[in-house]
Amino acid sequence: MADGFPWLTAIILLPLVASAFIPLLPDKEGKLVRWYALGVGIADFVLMCYTFWHHYDTSSATFQLVEKYDWLPQIGFSWAVSVDGISMPLVLLAGFVTTLSMLAAWQVNLKPRLFYFLMLVLYSAQIGVFVAQDLLLFFIMWELELVPVYLLVSIWGGQKRRYAATKFLLYTAAASIFILIAGLAMALYGDNTTFDIVELGAKNYPLALELLLYAGLLIAFGVKLAIFPLHTWLPDAHGEASAPVSMILAGVLLKMGGYGLIRLNLELLPDAHIYFAPVLATLGVINIIYGGLNSFAQTHMKRRLAYSSVSHMGFVLLGIASFTDVGVSGAMLQMLSHGLIAAVLFFLAGVTYDRTHTMAMDNLGGIGQAMPKVFALFTAGTMASLALPGMSGFVSELKVFIGVTTSDIYSPTFCTVMVFLAAVGVILTPIYLLSMLRQVFYGTGAELSCNINNGAYQNQEDEGTACFGTDCLLPGEAVYRDASVREVFIAVSFLVLIIGVGVYPKIATQLYDVKTVAVNTQVRQSYTQIAQSNPQIYAKGFFTPQIVEPEVMAVSGVIK
């Protein structure tokens, strides 16, 4: 705890406590509540920036801003929160994306009080997941975010919104059981019953137990990260969710899966990671290629972007499995980069939908002439997504490629195959993204059409029209208006960071590199010990049997 003030607790509770006052606001039309929610979001993000600027040391790999209060001491459960190089950048990402998503939902007119209440609760839950140092608290926060997401999709979604929301809830809730089981198993193992992540990392688990725990956690986090074949909830959720909710789904919620893999699977179960790493690498290239091929087959704009996210998350898996400092760093940067890029693309897809009231790309075409600002911003976001040099996506994918190529644990043959297959996915990316640009913005096809009784807008027949942009008009008033000042501001806010990180990656990497090096050192140390005790454990020609002894020791991802 810095200076005796509970900074992280304040960051978590501010949106949650503020949401409780929304029913008391004298606001019938929802105009006051949107300013209130946006103000809370900005205040919390400013509080994050102030806290990390003044009280966080980027040169340290240890947990910082630690707060711990006994909650149920009989079972070792406490309110324990802290941040390190893995969690701190993701906390900032969550605050940035969620605040801008509330600004993106400026025109919501269907139950605005409930909408912004759920957004603020979701804000708190996301932060709680990333800062929880107690594994049971991590699980509670993980479950807490399910409720607002389910309601946000099922109430403000498209025609099949209830199906998509239920599918998301069932997938995530069922998978999260593995987090609870793994947490209980680790907490109850040995003489010391505790859920504290630092203390759990100090325990010496049998290899068989580690493998079981790793497999269970991989399923739980694989669902959230949209790893094939656990990804099928994602296209449905994105296809039916409103643009502001899709921004959070793609920008923050997917990253919870990657964060969980690094925090629990790598840090707490490094021995099991030695056995599962080639599985992660294989799943990574499957995600990259499968997501790219499926994305190209989609005619629904947001479903195409959803499968694009599946493809990009494959690079996170590949980097985590690389056993190299640069590879793990690339995985972290890919999560941050994709969070920004996916959020701006889903937002701009929503802006386009507000004008055309269709996501079917076959029904669009030529709207770039009528909406040049939207066209320019969408093009910039697309260039970032296909990893154009100068954009953040290029740096993150390049680091992952270098990490896999230079890995001294995998054989040259394995590295070559992985890099080649991943490169195929990289080639697919401009194909499906540039074709989307062509279908939507080029040509002369699209006729003015704004029929709320057709397509994805049919869902609002019985509940009124829910708008998420400035130009959501009735059929008789339909026009293609260009982006408003508010919409340009949101998109440019994302693009400035995307280009900034692409031009000078150290802006982001200096926040976490010390920590990722420590985590990778710990994993490589485990590999050395296992390879020395059982050199025949790896298939010949698939791995190299030995690596150089690490120069530093690491315990629970902290350099000793």
From Swiss-Prot:
It catalyses: a plastoquinone + NADH + (n+1) H(+)(in) = a plastoquinol + NAD(+) + n H(+)(out); a plastoquinone + NADPH + (n+1) H(+)(in) = a plastoquinol + NADP(+) + n H(+)(out). Its main location: membrane. GO terms for cellular component: plasma membrane-derived thylakoid membrane. Pfam families: Proton_antipo_M. The keyword Nucleus does not apply. It is found in: Cellular thylakoid membrane. The chain crosses the membrane at residues 5-25, 35-55, 86-106, 114-134, 135-155, 168-188, 208-228, 242-262, 273-293, 310-330, 331-351, 374-394, 417-437, 488-508. One of its GO terms (molecular function) is NADH dehydrogenase (ubiquinone) activity. GO terms for biological process: ATP synthesis coupled electron transport; electron transport coupled proton transport. Signal peptide: none annotated. It is a multi-pass membrane protein. Its EC number is 7.1.1.-. InterPro entries: NADH_Q_OxRdtase_chain4, NADH_Q_OxRdtase_chainM/4, NADH_UbQ_OxRdtase, ND/Mrp_TM. Keywords: Membrane, NAD, NADP, Plastoquinone, Quinone, Thylakoid, Translocase, Transmembrane, Transmembrane helix. Belongs to the complex I subunit 4 family. This is NAD(P)H-quinone oxidoreductase chain 4-3. It comes from Nostoc sp. (strain PCC 7120 / SAG 25.82 / UTEX 2576). The lineage of its organism: Bacteria, Bacillati, Cyanobacteriota, Cyanophyceae, Nostocales.
